[in-house]
């Protein structure tokens, strides 16, 4: 079943075309890696997919329904941003309370388990957290949401190696038990190569590649490099 689909999706800012005629189809219960250099249009595309901004042209559908101004479709999506729209004075536990109110599949027990595993102080105010701990709040939101479509934009920003490894371990563990469509947008390409099943590559706002990782590698491409370099 198709979980998310775009047709001829474009977003223009004045004279700059950030996303250019992107047509993709994402299946249910698969993990996708969204790759590309800085400025390739990844974050803009994700914001459109999550209904955060409106495209200039084209369409986005989630399980066959238009995503824009559609609360039912929006509840199927959890979008974890680099900078979350969180009231800085809110306590961490209150952030998760709101998540519990919004996401139909929210698992509070699992969220509390993750809080312990990441050693996060749920009584602390969000603005008092380190950058890495703020990132972890987003990670817990994404994992515990159990949303049918879960999107992570640069999910390991500010995390040390141990916490990055823990995130991917928990992601795969939870995905195996509660399958869903997951999109990981990252510049740490080699770090996600063992996690993703399918690869989507944007180049200057246009779709360059969409295929399974296996087919992509069989055709002689290389997924490697520092700072979001994708070479072939």
Locate each region found by the language model.
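Helix-to-loop junction immediately C-terminal to a conserved catalytic motif
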Residues: 50
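Catalytic Walker B motif of ABC-type/P-loop ATPase nucleotide-binding domains
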Residues: 150-154
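ABC-family P-loop ATPase nucleotide-binding domains
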Residues: 81-137
């Amino acid at each position: 079943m198709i979980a998310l689909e775009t047709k001829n999706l474009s977003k223009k800012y004045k004279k700059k075309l950030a996303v250019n005629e992107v047509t993709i189809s994402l299946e249910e219960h698969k993990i996708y890696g969204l790759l590309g250099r800085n400025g390739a249009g990844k974050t803009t595309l994700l914001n459109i997919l999550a209904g955060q901004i409106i495209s200039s042209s084209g369409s986005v559908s989630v399980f066959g329904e238009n995503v824009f101004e559609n609360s039912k479709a929006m509840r199927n999506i959890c979008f974890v941003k680099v900078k979350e729209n969180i009231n800085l004075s809110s306590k961490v536990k209150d952030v998760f309370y709101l998540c519990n109110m919004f996401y139909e599949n929210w698992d509070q027990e699992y969220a509390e388990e993750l809080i312990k595993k990441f050693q996060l102080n749920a009584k602390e105010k969000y603005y008092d957290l380190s950058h890495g701990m703020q990132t972890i709040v987003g990670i817990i939101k994404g994992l515990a949401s159990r949303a049918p479509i879960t999107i992570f934009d640069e999910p390991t920003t500010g995390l040390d190696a141990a916490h990055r490894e823990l995130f991917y371990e928990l992601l795969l563990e939870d995905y195996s038990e509660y399958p869903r469509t997951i999109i990981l947008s990252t510049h740490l390409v080699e770090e996600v190569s063992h996690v993703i099943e399918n690869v989507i590559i944007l180049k200057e706002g246009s779709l360059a590649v969409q295929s399974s990782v296996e087919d992509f590698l069989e055709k002689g491409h290389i997924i490697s490099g520092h700072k979001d370099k994708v070479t072939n």
